[in-house]
A protein has these predicted regions:
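ATP-dependent phospho-/nucleotidyl transfer catalytic cores
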Residues: 1-50, 59-61, 66, 123, ...
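Active-site activation/catalytic loop segments of kinase-like enzymes and analogous catalytic loops
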Residues: 7-17, 78-112, 126-143, 155-162
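Hydrophobic HxD+1 residue recognition
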Residues: 53
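Conserved protein kinase catalytic core
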Residues: 58, 75-77
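Activation of the activation-loop gatekeeper triad in protein kinase-fold domains
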Residues: 69-73
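Acidic, serine/threonine- and proline-rich low-complexity regulatory regions
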Residues: 112-122
């Protein structure tokens, strides 16, 4: 699911960027980079993944947190929903707050290999935010819902924050440095 959904970035955002679409090989290169990121996911066991796990889909019910909007749930990587929650484009939080949530989560769930979990968390956050940029571009272009465009700069900021240090993002970092981001969709 995440790999195919990441291609929404290619199909909509890159298509809106005339400079890149004039050079078809750039789309192929970015697809290969996305595919390689997906292949670098380390955790192979699957768990329930809500896929739309964010504060707006949580509510208190009988003194417990309940989730709504789970019709698109799948079996997938255990880091996906946490990446959705921590790097949600609709809610701006500090990097220290994000880091603290991740630390608390890891302390509660006792993963055997925390570095594998963090690796997957970062990759899934980036892939998910690329997907979101693609979806928001599609909403603007196809459905004339332009209100989501204002969230794209923060999605880029979330991506930039995640790709800084992880060596898995070397090729993506180079691609993004060499190719301009769309200023207006």
């Amino acid at each position: 699911y995440i790999l195919e959904e990441s291609y929404l970035f290619l199909d909509w955002y890159l298509a809106a960027n005339k400079l890149i679409t004039q050079k078809g090989h750039l789309k192929k290169n970015l697809k290969k980079i996305i595919d390689n990121l997906y292949l670098n996911l380390k955790i192979k066991h699957k768990v329930f993944v809500h896929r739309d796990f964010h504060v707006s889909n949580m509510m208190f019910y009988k003194n417990k947190i309940a989730l709504i909007d789970s019709q698109d749930a799948v079996l997938g990587n255990p880091a996906y929903d946490l990446a959705s929650l921590i790097d949600d484009v609709r809610i701006k939080t500090s990097n220290s707050f994000k880091s603290n949530i991740l630390k608390v989560f890891l302390s509660k769930f006792n993963y055997k290999n925390e570095s594998q979990f963090i690796n997957d968390f970062e990759i899934l956050s980036v892939l998910r935010n690329l997907k979101i940029i693609g979806i928001f571009t599609r909403l603007a272009k196809r459905d004339k819902k332009r209100k989501y465009l204002k969230l794209i700069p923060y999605a880029w900021k979330l991506i930039d924050n995640r790709i800084k240090l992880n060596p898995n993002f070397h090729d993506l970092k180079n691609f993004l440095q060499k190719n301009p981001r769309i200023k207006k969709i």
